[in-house]
């Protein structure tokens, strides 16, 4: 799905990422970990194309739908909570309009064997398939269900987003990202502004999410419950572990011990050769 090949990023004489390589496949659930400033958020921005590497390439399908929740964003909107959330369905609503138009045209045509008629049938079936994930629920119902899951009360749906704090506006943005049903989710500290109940709801949602996930979080339990692969960013390099966070901690400790033992053995060999 996404390949990061020989990627480096330097600025001001400092190398943040040094020739890193890794691949994100369909269904991968990756926890991106490392100290603050290691480059985790930058990797997400590089994948999105918000930032450009100094060298190397990121390969991804041109039609890949990426959902991205940054750690911080500005909010200057006067729409109601529900109206702002419903903007996530702009593409879906456009598809519904197109489906209605095709259905109307098919009803008026009688050239059933023509190429044009058959193409309309194919297009209608394609749109129907793309809309099938709604599972009988209207966009409004899905939006309301997601907002409730993220902690909003129904009586708050018609309040202006400008009357809510940045934390609550981030919940609205998260709802929109989830409702767009992307092929891959890139989430940067999504639990920062969530209470326990909302975190539990988000965990359950992500566990059932059929796409790929790249998650940055300081919540170890959340990482364990939502990911099965851990990519550590350390001093410009990455270390890829095919396990969740807790198992990664154990394997990382073993790796450090092995490196320490190898270094000590090398030092002993040097001392012997110089004796």
Residue ranges and their predicted role:
Residues 1-265:
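ABC ATP-binding cassette signature C-motif
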Residues 267-275:
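Short cytosolic helices in intracellular loops of multi-pass membrane proteins
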